[in-house]
Amino acid sequence: MTALKENNVIIGIDPGIRNTGWGIISNFENKLQHIDHGVIVPETEDSDASRLFFISSHLDEILNNYKPSLAVIEKIFVSASGESALKLGMARGVALNVIASKKNIRIVELAARFVKKAITGSGAADKNQIKFMIEKLLGKRVSKLDASDALAIAIAGSNSKNKKLNPYNVITKSQKKNVNNNLINAINRALNKS
């Protein structure tokens, strides 16, 4: 692996109380490079508080190890289940708290549909389609869907890494329309490899 400049390291986070996916990439001179990925999986029999502590401590360790300058996290999608949305919100809040406690990490929040569209060209893509594209883009096998989602979040967020963003920035409609041509070209190159 080539030496990475610290300011090119990006973490994507797909929060969840059962599984929190994370993916680390760099985007140097518009070249995506896979660094690492994984899924934080608390014990199923643990209380919500214990699960949240487990997520917090493991995410803190990951951030300390890779020292990203940009953290990209998925926004909450409100589903029919209020309890699911609440638990997702708790996991997301813990992740944001850990990230916010670090110096020099900017935070970008992206909607799931935006990430799907940026990676696959369709805002309605399923997890397997995202996984397929991530493996093509990064040239790396990713066995867990939560990890491939997190890598997708990181890649979509890397599109805005050189723009001046405020912490907790929400991508606007005009930014959604202006998807980085380099990312589209990388997707097309990856599709041509298969």
Annotate each language-model stretch with its function:
Residues 1-194:
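Phosphate- and other anionic-substrate recognition elements at nucleic-acid/protein interfaces
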